[in-house]
From Swiss-Prot:
Disulphide bonds in the chain: none
Species whose genome carries this gene: Salmonella typhi
Gene Ontology CC annotation, any one: plasma membrane
Keywords: Cell membrane, Membrane, Signal, Transmembrane, Transmembrane helix
Name recorded for this polypeptide: Phosphoglycerate transport regulatory protein PgtC
Gene that specifies this protein: pgtC
């Protein structure tokens, strides 16, 4: 499959959904290898890469490095990826079954909370430990996150919450958190950058973005108690002009030397090969690997539903949501009791759990007019619920 590293003067173009800092160390170390080929990275969102590669491959991309199985599934369905065989079993068991013929897992990451200690101290707040904590009223105007439609990394984090807590309880948690958001970041690594700058005190991020910032004493990262494992995948474009060199790079990443480099804290990731017991990062790697895998079939089937629901429920009405939650928190504080009926109006979604797993119904979201009609219905539904919640709050004054 992979071949050996030989001397090439040509340049490899690697499209990636990761930030430049997340790939710099790996590429830097690769390029110290005898006979290695230069790698130029093209850093884009998944959506941007889909558009680029669905048309003529104008940038002459040779391979893809991403944590997004959705992007790879899309490219595979459009016959854009080359077949890859003979990958190690330990690597391939981490790859969703539907893309195993074209994609290889070379590293893993986990999800958690990046926290700005100084910003937290300025507000006299304890650090949040999990999704549930982020919905507490004390974090009003203090949190940041991205959205599934803007970031596939965020999509996987949201799906891990929905799968672990269940559809209904998961959305209730997300909607409670929405009342505490400063803004919705356009990129998942933008969340980390904004927290570092002090725009917010905490936010959910993938560990490799957080770990690269932890030389800043004001920042801390804590994994979610049951963080799902998020593999880093590599795939070769079918029309790559340098397929042998691309395979050589993948071979290097999976080699003992490549895995040692991926084990280095400078990558912010963990290798797929087990770390030795005396490695300080071994325990967290084992915890991640021990978690049940996400249901990727379900993720892929309801990708459109989750993205459109998040934007309709949260992104497109964030200002109104924050006002409604501020009013609810104020009323609960004043009355010194919870208001579950009003809270239920602000934490419900107009799609039930059974529908969220109904593949026949979910397939209809591939029809743009159906999806847009549903979003219009949801907008009205959320607006009516919010108006009713505000009306009930005013009655309590």
């Amino acid at each position: 499959m992979f071949g050996s590293c030989q001397a090439y003067s040509r340049e490899l173009v690697m499209a990636t959904t990761f930030s430049p800092s997340a790939t710099a160390w790996i590429i830097q170390r690769w390029q110290t290898e005898p006979g290695s080929v230069m790698i130029r990275t093209l850093n884009r969102t998944s959506g941007s890469l889909e558009q680029l590669l669905d048309t003529a491959n104008a940038e002459n991309v040779d391979l893809i490095l991403t944590s997004s199985p959705m992007l790879l599934q899309h490219l595979q369905e459009h016959q854009k990826l080359a077949l890859l065989d003979s990958a190690p079993a330990a690597s391939q068991k981490l790859v969703p079954r539907s893309i195993r013929s074209t994609s290889v897992a070379v590293a893993v990451s986990g999800f958690g909370l990046l926290i700005n200690r100084s910003a937290l101290a300025a507000r006299h707040l304890p650090p949040p430990a999990d999704w549930q904590d982020m919905g507490l009223p004390s974090y009003q105007g203090a949190l940041l996150m991205s959205s599934p439609s803007r970031s596939d990394t965020n999509h996987l984090m949201v799906e891990s919450l929905l799968q672990q807590k269940g559809w209904t309880a998961g959305w209730a948690t997300l909607l409670a958190i929405s009342g505490n958001l400063v803004t919705i970041s356009s990129r998942s690594f933008g969340v980390a950058d904004k927290i570092k700058s002090g725009l917010g005190v905490a936010g959910p991020v993938i560990d490799n973005y957080a770990n690269l910032l932890l030389n800043d004493p004001n920042l801390a990262f804590t994994y979610f108690p049951y963080s799902a494992v998020s593999p880093t995948y590599v795939a070769v474009l079918k029309n790559s002009r340098h397929a042998d060199e691309a395979r050589a790079f993948i071979h290097y990443l999976l080699s003992p030397k490549g895995q040692r480099i991926l084990a280095d804290a400078n990558t912010g990731k963990y290798p797929v090969a087990p770390l030795s017991a005396d490695n300080p990062r071994a325990a967290q790697q084992q915890r991640l690997m021990a978690q049940p895998p996400l249901n990727y079939r379900l993720i892929l089937k309801r990708q459109q539903l989750v993205q459109r629901m998040f934007d309709t429920a949260i992104s497109f009405r964030l200002a109104q949501l924050k006002d409604a939650w501020r009013a609810l928190h104020s009323a609960e504080t004043r009355l010194k009791r919870p208001l579950p009926e009003i809270r239920a109006l602000l934490t419900s979604v107009p799609v039930d759990a059974a529908s969220s797993e109904d593949e026949t119904w979910l397939a209809q979201f591939d029809n743009k007019s159906f999806a847009e009609q549903k979003m219009m219905e949801w907008q009205i539904w959320f607006l009516n619920n919010q108006r009713l919640a505000i009306h009930k709050l005013e009655e309590l004054k």
